[in-house]
A protein has these predicted regions:
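Alpha/beta-hydrolase fold catalytic core
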Residues: 2-4, 10-13, 18-78, 313
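Conserved HGGG/HGGXW glycine-rich cap/lid loop of the alpha/beta-hydrolase fold
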Residues: 68-116
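Active-site loop/oxyanion-hole signature of alpha/beta-hydrolase fold enzymes
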Residues: 108-149
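Flexible "cap/lid" loop of the alpha/beta hydrolase fold
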Residues: 156-164, 171-199
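Conserved alpha/beta-hydrolase catalytic His-Asp/Glu region
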Residues: 183-188, 198-253
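Short beta-strand/loop motif that positions the catalytic acidic residue
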Residues: 254, 260-262
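Acidic catalytic loop of the alpha/beta-hydrolase fold
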Residues: 265-269, 294
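Catalytic histidine-centered segment of alpha/beta-hydrolase-like enzymes
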Residues: 292-301, 305
């Protein structure tokens, strides 16, 4: 199963890299043309308005490019960093942000090797460089003893950051973290996402949403549009290939309070993920959200929000 998954990813990378060599219009790590990038950014801005709370957007210069950070919530609130899922960007938090920003100072960061408003000006980053990049952002904002929420791939990055000897993280929330405790649970089902990248179409996109969400009809149309354009226009990269489940020792090194949430129809995680989390994370709580898929923060927003807020406060 895993071999099938990685073969599909490799085929995707070969096809898209050949296409980018042939059709590249300008120097951008993510997008082929200026018009495609602008169309995507217009969709991003529309989706971000779904936050429906006051926020500011800031760009932070780093050693590897520009980090785009969206800030919201009370200035005297405890700092809460949000790391989104793959290709989802910080706009994905629209069903959760009002609850999260009520008592916390939010720092939502777009990952610089994916579609979004962060921009990569260096070569693709290694895991070590990803840690450096985020730490530069944390240092810029002088974040100490902050809480962090990571969704899907953002959950994997969160565990990567928390497993470092020197970090300033306090409480951790993982929303169906990808490739973190085990490899993807249902490889054949998730292959729809890879096929979407290979041959993007509205039909394949909707099928992918049906795979990852129990209630795709509840996903806002503006956010759907942005997410679709991310899959349609963005070049693929090999970062997913570098994601491996963390070792027993790496997980045991994390002493922070951790909450792990997955959906009962999750195609990325299963109860085995929660069992391993409970076994090797020394201070861990887990919960399975009913009638939710991998997109549990959208499928069951209120239940997810309540569980997260109760844990953080």
């Amino acid at each position: 199963m895993q071999n099938l998954y990685f073969r599909l990813v490799l085929i995707l990378l070969v096809i898209t890299s050949c296409s980018s060599i042939k059709e590249a219009k300008f120097d951008d790590y993510i997008f082929e043309t200026k018009s495609e990038k602008q169309s995507y950014l217009n969709a991003y801005d529309k989706a971000l308005k779904l936050w429906d709370i006051p926020y500011t957007e800031e760009n932070v210069k780093t050693s590897f490019g520009t980090a785009h950070v969206i800030i919201a919530g009370p200035k005297n609130g405890k700092s809460l960093v949000l790391l989104h899922g793959m290709d989802a960007t910080s706009t994905m938090w629209y069903p959760n942000i009002k609850a999260l920003a009520k008592n916390h100072r939010i720092y939502a960061i777009d990952f610089l090797m994916e579609p979004g408003k962060s921009t990569l000006t260096a070569k693709p980053l290694s895991s070590k460089e990803i840690v450096i990049w985020y730490n530069e952002i944390f240092s810029f904002y002088k974040l100490k003893q902050f809480d962090i929420i990571g969704a899907s791939k953002g959950g994997w990055i969160t565990v990567l950051l928390a497993s470092q000897e020197k970090n300033s993280i306090d409480k951790i929330v993982l929303l169906s973290p990808a490739q973190t405790f085990k490899f993807i649970d249902k490889v054949r089902k998730t292959s729809s996402a890879l096929l979407l990248k290979l041959f993007p179409s509205e039909k394949k996109f909707n099928k992918t949403l049906e795979t990852f969400s129990t209630h795709p009809q509840n996903i806002n149309s503006n956010y759907k549009r942005q997410f679709y354009l991310a899959n349609k226009y963005a070049k693929s990269n090999s970062s997913m290939l570098k994601m491996r489940p963390f070792s027993d020792e790496e997980l045991q090194s994390i002493v922070n309070p951790v909450l792990v949430l997955i959906g009962d129809h999750d195609v990325i995680n299963s109860e085995e993920s929660l069992t391993r989390a409970q076994k090797f994370l020394t201070n861990c709580k887990t919960q399975t959200i009913k009638d939710a898929g991998h997109f549990l923060s959208i499928d069951q927003a209120k239940i997810t929000n309540d569980a997260v807020i109760n844990f953080l406060e």
